[in-house]
Amino acid sequence: MPGLNGRRVAVVAGVRTPFTKAGTALKDVRAVDLARYAARELLERTNLDGQEVDEVIFGQVVPSPLVPNIGREVSLLPQFPKEIPAYSLNRACASASQAITAGHDQIVLGNAAVIIAGGAEALSDIPILASRRLADILVEASKAKSLGARLKAFTKIRPKDLVPVAPAIAEPSTGESMGQSAEKMAKENHIAREDQDRWALQIGRASCRERV
């Protein structure tokens, strides 16, 4: 749709990697690899010169501590200019959609002409955290000034401290996941399931028309 300055934004093409269950066919593939595969394939299918891309934006719900900015990593592919900006964002389940929206806004505002935006997730590659108590003990040991003090810190470790902690899905403040919050909002605003399905169908049909 056109912005206030008359610039019209279009989604030219899109690609997606296969969906598989965590720990199966793609268990050795990281989220950043999936994002790079998709970006390269997009350029290949559209014959787009990567040098024409002005910005890269990617959404990710559970980023890896080893790859904190997945958008930046995608932008470092040799196909893209070295000087383009790139960043990542998190809006829970809507992270990829938010990345696309952010790209739209950049084009409308005249800050870019071509943007690659999307999202990537690999549940086989999510960070598994240590317990807070174990983390505190490890920090204490790292600051110890002698071997004896370091060993003394390690003696505080208990078996329960070694139990891994998976990333939280629910918000710590509300105890609700994004899906639960959405259901709650729909109920409070009297949005029937049929209306939601009708809207989804309308969007799907519009998307198909745009591709014809």
Residue ranges: model-predicted function:
Residues Q60-L66:
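Glycine-rich phosphate-binding loops at beta-strand->alpha-helix junctions
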